Amino acid sequence: MTNKILSQVKPSLQRLIPYEPGKPIEDLAREYGFSPSQIIKLASNENPLGPSPRALDALGRNLHKIHLYPDGYGYYLKEALSHHLDIDAENIVLGNGSNEIIELLFHVFATNEEDEVLFSKYAFAVYKLMAELFGVPFKEIADVSFNHDLKAMLEAIGPKTKLIFIANPNNPTGTRVSNEDLYLFLERVPDEVIVAIDEAYIDFVPDPPQTLSFVKKRDNIVILRTFSKMYGLAGLRIGYGVASKYVARYLERARQPFNTNSLAQIAATASLEDTQHRLLTLKITEEGKKRLEENFDRLGLPFIPSSANFILVHVGDGDFIFRALLKKGIIVRSMKSYGLAEWVRITIGTEDQLSRLLEELPLALLSFKNNRPQ
């Protein structure tokens, strides 16, 4: 890029380090000569069962309509969510993944260096990325045992604070705050500060906080949810926010027309009806979590007890273990980009996927031990 063009690029964008997603199966297949069917991906917390059969059936019945623009309002999905959540459709804002709702919050509430955003040290990387993209100052609040320090977050609120992000359960640590502590925090946050509670993994929590009740009584609470995890629709990019009707109207104004495609809306609507798929997903998640924890204990690997569908585990050198497993056709997630260089995050897969992981992981650990500088 010439200096003349570079001078026109926003300074905040020049400094931005792009988000690094989990390695795609297709990339690994090209690099190592694997067939895609030989590869297991345990990096991005996707549902190993895939989408609901009802979603696949609905997609098949509607493929012939893709020459038409989608419903820009998302009427049927909003109505389904309204029934599912027991909240008015006017409280719901659809997004191209819940990431888009995060971006919309910045468009509406925090757009320049006069504002400020708060989030935890080991929080979802997109909060920081969006703050940097918009040129908004931010404070990373130190964690307590890999969890949110809500007391410190309250104390950090200042006159410039516009947005607070709390992922619960948190990604990438898998930790959650107690319902009581969260309720107390929400009651104490000033009315003019928006609190975005990112509940991407809330479907895996047996006793979830009743955060929607706060949306019904306060304008400054926004709930973020996704169909990418429990519902297995990550590739269709569909999520939503739940906010007061007043806030929802402004989020709607900020979004692009037709921001959620027709197939995503159709699949998400059908997925909400499939209780059996959700129960089966929960079953393999809990069984797989127990199995991984038992094996990590046996291998002497410290891990963070998780309330989500993944586990953060200490392996000594996350990049080394990540690369060693890649050579065996297994994709996990190195946590170096999160400042957790000695850790990897592992999605809880199917029984067969975990068997293969647990066969190769000890060999990767042994290789690290033998190659570690003395």
From Swiss-Prot:
GO terms for molecular function: histidinol-phosphate transaminase activity; pyridoxal phosphate binding. Its EC number is 2.6.1.9. SUPFAM superfamilies: PLP-dependent transferases. Signal peptide: none annotated. InterPro entries: Aminotransferase_I/II_large, HisP_aminotrans, HistidinolP_aminotransfase, PyrdxlP-dep_Trfase, PyrdxlP-dep_Trfase_major, PyrdxlP-dep_Trfase_small. The keyword Magnesium does not apply. Pathway: Amino-acid biosynthesis; L-histidine biosynthesis; L-histidine from 5-phospho-alpha-D-ribose 1-diphosphate: step 7/9. The modification N6-(pyridoxal phosphate)lysine is found at residue 229. Its cofactor is pyridoxal 5'-phosphate. The keyword Transferase applies. Keywords: Amino-acid biosynthesis, Aminotransferase, Histidine biosynthesis, Pyridoxal phosphate, Transferase. It is an enzyme of class 2 (transferase). CDD domains: AAT_like. It catalyses: L-histidinol phosphate + 2-oxoglutarate = 3-(imidazol-4-yl)-2-oxopropyl phosphate + L-glutamate. Homodimer. This is Histidinol-phosphate aminotransferase. It comes from Methylacidiphilum infernorum (isolate V4) (Methylokorus infernorum (strain V4)).
